[in-house]
Amino acid sequence: MSGNSAANAAALAAFNGIGKKKKESTTKLNGTDNNTNHLGVIGSTSNQTKQHQQQQQQPQALRTPLPAHPSRKKSNKFSQLKRLNTAPAMASLQPALQIASPSISPTQPSAPASALDSDPDYFTLSPHTIPSKNEIAKSPQTPQDMIRNVRQSIELKAIPNNAQAKRLSVDYSPQEMLKNLRHSLHSRTKTSPMLTTSDKMGQTMLAEMRDRLENTRRIASNSVASLSLSPNLDFNKSTSDVSNLSHHYDVDTVSTDSFASFNSSINDRHLPHGISIDVTNHDSDEDEIDDREREEDHEPLDNGELKSTNNKVTVSSRLRRKPPPGEDFQMQLNDKSRDTISSGSYSLNPDEVYSFTDPDSYENLVSEVEVGETTRLFPQFPDANHYHQHSSKFRKKHQKVKPINGIYYRDMDSSNTSDTEESTSNLPSRSTTPLLGQPQQQVHFRSTMRKANTKKDKKSRFNELKPWKNHNDLNYLTDQEKKRYEGIWASNKGNYMSQVVIKLHGVNYETQKDPKEEAKMEHSRTAALLSAAAVEDSNYNGNNSLHNLDSVEINQLICGPVVKRIWKRSRLPSDTLEKIWNLIDFRRDGTLNKNEFLVGMWLVDQCLYGRKLPKKVDNVVWDSLGGIGVNVTVKKKK
């Protein structure tokens, strides 16, 4: 049974290796020819021919007798496998073992066919003498073997993290590699070809340009240094101490402690103007070179070879463009040093010292300050006027400042200050201290001892930022508004009035008729004049003189379309303009006189300010057209 089971397993593996698509055969195998043909398909063609010849030569020795009644057995899968495996044919067993061997043990290769052929006992064994299942070599594909194989494959494919292996050259360290690279670069630079002629020409051109720039710089510095500051000031270099690198004006120095220089010279000659300015340079390294160059340039001047100013101008004119004066020159003109203000010292002659207690000396100083323009007074910074003050507690502290001759002084006669504020205003302050040379302000006395009612004045003021606030000027036309509206009236009155065909109120057409003009007029226009009539107002109040209803010249009226075009420029809605027209139109003939036009313009401006239109124009507005517009109320005596 053990031999049959091993044969069945080998045959099943061979059958699966041929192809899984084939279905189970339904025909019975009744002869040995079918068995040999079926097994011959599995083997190779060359081995099949050789084995077939051997079967023909020795059929009796290799074959075993078949059972007597093979047809009685059932044709199932296992019976077919038994029949195939029991065949002792040499050609049928060899390919079956070769096909089944890789499926059983893929890691260990099967024995070659030559080794099987060389075995003398292999072909003599019968199917029943095949080794048992235990005798077959076991497959090494256990889980431990599989894990071991996977580990070996991973270790072989892994890249070792070794710095020595990654280096291109293990023999050299990084320092040696850098040294070799430098050596190669130096060797290449030494072996490089010589400079071409073009490179040499470029170097020579650069050298020439540098020389030209240096010469121009020296000439410019000499020309600036040679310029004199003023006809009365001598700018000379101090010979007391060269290391100080300071330029002095040779004057009698009577310097103060706050503006005195530490390195100023004392033994100098006197000049009448009595001003000494010490300009010190703190940049020692750069200024030493400049001073040496200036000493070399000034050596021929000291020896007597003096040049005129004309020659200096010609030297500077040779430049293409004269350089602008530097910061040093500008500061020297302003009597200030370049580095620090404290380095300059301002002094006065003892004869020119003024005392504020002596009136004669003070008057002389005032006259000189008024005449002289070089003296610069310190500017005064007045207090800013704060318009938006929402608290009444702090309003009294802010006093208005009035300018007098360009200098601001506090108003000593302001009615807004109280007695306590007058006592505090006498204290010294920065903005109230008068400058020297300005006339003292005259003292003004109050006209009355009563205090002004500031609250009432503030209420009556007109705030331009809030024009909609209620004040007295909103009830009538002011003089400024009246003049502005009269200019518009004068430039537009009488325009297109000759084209009006409606009979107008107050116009005497009999005195103005011209027979020549009537003859030239068309018949349609004459008929319109005869048939048309003005609309009469039944609610007429009798203001004939105000609205010129009785008598008026045609040139003193303005046409309705002209008024419409003027009012349209205000960009008010047409409904609002219609209401304004109805409020002022007393003539009812499509025209307006001067008073009506002025009131209409005033109402347009009031609408632009944001006020609402009244239901009726007050008499105060109409009265303001003829006079100042001030209503005086007389109180009765008690």
Curated annotation (Swiss-Prot):
InterPro entries xrefs: EF-hand-dom_pair, EF_hand_dom, EH_dom
Q: Which GO terms describe its cellular component?
A: cytoplasm; plasma membrane
Q: Where is the composition biased (Polar residues)?
A: 27-47, 306-317, 427-440
- Example GO biological process term? cellular response to starvation
In this chain, composition skew of type Basic and acidic residues spans: 291-305
Q: What does this protein do?
A: Positive regulator of phosphatidylinositol 4,5-bisphosphate turnover and negatively regulates signaling through the cell integrity pathway. Involved in rDNA silencing.
> Protein name, please?
Increased rDNA silencing protein 4
Identify the species of origin. Candida albicans (strain SC5314 / ATCC MYA-2876)
Task: Give the gene name.
Answer: IRS4
